Amino acid sequence: MEDLVCVSNHNICIHISVNILFIDIYITILMSKQESDNVFWIYDPMILFRDGNYLKIFPTKDMTQIQVLNALTRLCIYLAIIFVLVSAISGYAYVPIIFILIIIVIYFFNNNKNSVQTEMFDDNYPNTNNSDNIDNTDNIMNKQNYKKISDYNPYMNLTLNDIGSGNDDLEANLVELPKDSNRKFYTTSSTTNPNKQEDFMKWIYDLPETCKENQACCLRHEDVRFKRHNPDIDSPTPNS
């Protein structure tokens, strides 16, 4: 029984290994096909019609930039053939040819642009900065005093021992403080843009209703003699 289990497990392992091998071969073939399709047609003209590419005449969002240019070139070739076969519009056969030339120019323009960007990120690309006017970064970093990592403070947090240290270069200029405090600050009347001119005019001329227009705005008449805490009535007079 144990021998049968071992044989069955061995067969399963062989089957899985064969499947993995076929998957690797398929992925390799698929990647090589994608790399071969991503070649501009001037380097391999047969790529326009090889492996079913002759049906790809309209660009899609899944295509690369080179595949889009190849598809447009293929479309221009088909249009040129149609214009030549139809004698009535054979004079328009030059239009697709002009578009093909434009596609070639676009390819070389984008290719040069990408090559320049690649060189800019290359380590061997020469430095275009003016080193005479810019100090060396390493020298600047060596001159400055940086907090170093220690066992008791691995995150370089500010500790109580750091308070009051590192300020040896501060200038004790006692004249600057009162001079800056006596500076005149002027706040303009208009603090918004555009200014609130309409609100300002309403505040000046748009008076609220008075007692003459609305009696609810009139002050209530109160007789001081009958107020509850009238000092003239409640408090005793000196002669009493």
Curated annotation (Swiss-Prot):
Coiled-coil region: none
Record Pfam families: P9_TM (PF19066)
Location(s) in or outside the cell: Membrane
InterPro entries reported for this sequence: P9_TM
Glycosylation sites: 129, 157
Keyword Coiled coil: no
Segments passing through the bilayer: 12-32, 66-86, 89-109
One GO CC term on file: membrane
Topology versus the membrane: Multi-pass membrane protein
Keywords associated with the record: Glycoprotein, Membrane, Transmembrane, Transmembrane helix
Protein name: Uncharacterized protein R468
